[in-house]
Swiss-Prot record:
It catalyses: all-trans-violaxanthin = all-trans-neoxanthin; a carotenoid psi-end group = a carotenoid beta-end derivative. Expressed exclusively in chromoplast-containing tissues of flowers and fruits. Expressed in preanthesis flowers. NCBIfam families: carotene-cycl. GO terms for biological process: carotene biosynthetic process; ubiquinone biosynthetic process; xanthophyll biosynthetic process. GO terms for molecular function: lycopene beta cyclase activity; neoxanthin synthase activity; oxidoreductase activity; oxidoreductase activity, acting on paired donors, with incorporation or reduction of molecular oxygen. This is Neoxanthin synthase, chloroplastic. Its EC number is 5.3.99.9, 5.5.1.19. Pathway: Carotenoid biosynthesis; neoxanthin biosynthesis; Carotenoid biosynthesis; beta-carotene biosynthesis. The lineage of its organism: Eukaryota, Viridiplantae, Streptophyta, Embryophyta, Tracheophyta. It is an enzyme of class 5 (isomerase). Involved in the synthesis of neoxanthin, the last product of carotenoid synthesis and a precursor of abscisic acid. Involved in the beta-carotene biosynthesis. The gene is NSY. It comes from Solanum lycopersicum (Tomato). It is found in: Plastid, Chloroplast. Belongs to the lycopene cyclase family.
Length: 498
């Protein structure tokens, strides 16, 4: 939802492999002269005609590299030794490198392209970045957000929203890393090897770099983090575009957080039926009368919703809104794993970012949370590596993993995962009813929930308030669809408390 920005617009810290779909208009094995097309086929063909609109426009933006004089590891040196090796130069990786290195810890950051611009758009609540001292990294702010529940009801939220300036944020983090003498190495990490008190990474060019601790910040697709439970994720999937348009219907002082309306599918019965079961919403950032970021998003599904389906719904929506796209500036394909189990705690490789479990299980938000938790993890690392006792090996791994995931934070995450499991059981009508009640709550509850600021007790109170504010149908949804996820929640909380 945040990039999609998105958790997982070419998502997040390290972009996962995008889902790509290929449409073949006239397969050679079908003969139109001998086969009569079914009604379903005709409906699909109608959608395909729409599908050929702005989706056929190539993005005009080109990959950009930043001009920063960073310090490189000597590729010819045979003795590259560091305290901490960070795999990945996404937002989470650079934030951690900045935070750890300011304590005098020797840090090396390894990435295939450390100076390349991040490809995603990131959205955050303005107060989140203000609290982190990063408000100067926002390039646009909206004083209000809105949520369209249906054609007859809209919620207006007095909480400012902002778009992160990828360039400003990356420059800020890189410059801090330069000041703190962080070293960079341009390569892809193929393997991580461990000894009792030391680990090594092996890069695709054969280079080996040694360190006391390896932290994986390479994103969701990483193979370096281990799990001891099945990874039953939910998935957020979205298609986002920054586009130049003739005009659009959005108020420039309001960011559209969610638009759950489905009137745009009135002439698309095939799409409308599917949307009623597994709904998608529009996320919109209007910058000017002719410039807007648009994203069609499946909040969470299991298995992941078809990417082709998401794009077709977006085409139908923009056509209904009368938005004519003149050019596509940027395009994002985003898939974010949400919820599921945490990595095995502890283990030899530390994690931060998409593969560490910090993605909000109910919303997909992660960037602001990564910025907030990197200093927490940095302190745990420094307590080990910066101590006079020189803690290494298993003691260090235990300290850093539990620094990121203490018991209370693990229990809170289980509660947010319960929220995700509830969303998975709701159709469009149920989802609308839930958000109608959710945004009627005291702002401290809905704001705290979306920003991962609530305790287990506060989340319990939120649930009671939600039940009280909900319609009779919402209460029925909760009573009939939540018992099994609730049993799982209680079981998981019991396991975490052992």
């Amino acid at each position: 939802m945040e990039t999609l920005l998105k958790p997982f617009p070419s998502l997040l810290l390290s972009s996962p492999t995008p889902y790509r779909s290929i449409v073949q208009q006239n397969p050679s094995f079908l003969s139109p002269t001998t086969k009569k097309k079914s009604r379903k086929c005709l409906l699909r063909n109608k959608s395909s005609k729409l599908f050929c609109s702005f989706l056929d426009l190539a993005p005009t933006s080109k990959p950009e590299s930043l001009d920063v004089n960073i310090s490189w590891v000597d590729p010819n040196s045979n003795r590259a030794q560091f305290d901490v090796i960070i795999i990945g130069a996404g937002p989470a990786g650079l934030r951690l490198a900045e935070q750890v290195s300011k304590y005098g810890i020797k840090v090396c950051c390894v990435d295939p392209s450390p100076l390349s611009m991040w490809p995603n758009n990131y959205g955050v609540w303005v107060d989140e970045f203000e609290n982190l001292g990063l408000e100067d990294c926002l390039d646009h702010k909206w004083p209000m957000t809105c949520v369209h529940i249906n054609d007859n009801k809209t919620k207006y939220l007095g909480r400012p929203y902002g778009r992160v300036s990828r360039k400003k944020l990356k420059l800020k983090l890189l410059n801090s890393c330069v000041e703190n003498r962080v070293k960079f190495y341009k390569a892809k990490v193929w393997k991580v090897e461990h000894e009792e008190f030391e680990s090594s990474i092996v890069c695709d060019d054969g280079k080996k770099i040694r360190g006391s601790l390896v932290v994986d910040a390479s994103g969701f697709a990483s193979d370096f983090i281990e799990y001891d439970r099945p990874r039953n994720h939910g998935y957020q999937i979205a298609h986002g575009v920054l586009v130049e348009v003739d005009n659009h219907p959005f108020d420039l002082d309001k960011m559209v957080l969610m638009d759950w309306r489905d009137s745009h599918l009135g002439n698309e019965p095939y799409l409308r039926v599917n949307n009623a079961k597994e709904p998608t919403f529009l996320y919109a950032m209007p910058f000017d009368r002719d410039l807007v970021f648009l994203e069609e998003t499946s909040l969470v599904s299991r298995p992941v919703l078809s990417y082709m389906e998401v794009k077709r719904r977006m085409v139908a929506r923009l056509r209904h809104l009368g938005i004519k796209v003149k050019s596509v500036i940027e395009e994002e394909k985003c898939v974010i794993p949400m919820g599921g189990p945490l990595p095995r705690i502890p283990q030899n490789v530390m994690a931060i970012g998409g593969n560490s479990g910090i993605v909000h299980p109910s919303t997909g938000y992660m960037v602001a949370r990564s910025m907030a938790l990197a200093p927490v993890l940095a302190e745990a690392i420094v307590e080990g590596l910066g101590s006079t006792r020189m803690i290494r090996g298993s003691q260090l791994y235990h300290r850093v993993w539990n620094g990121l995931w203490p018991l209370d934070r693990r229990c809170v995450r289980e509660c947010y995962s319960f929220g995700m499991e509830t969303l998975l059981k709701l159709d469009l009508k149920g989802t609308r009813r839930l958000f109608d009640a959710f945004f009627d709550l005291d702002p401290k509850y809905w704001q705290g929930f979306l920003s991962s600021r609530l305790s287990v007790k506060e989340l319990g109170l939120l649930s009671l308030c939600l039940f009280g504010h909900g319609s009779n149908m919402t209460r029925l949804d909760i009573v009939t669809k939540c018992p099994l996820p609730l049993v799982r929640l209680i079981g998981n909380l019991a396991i975490e408390s052992l």
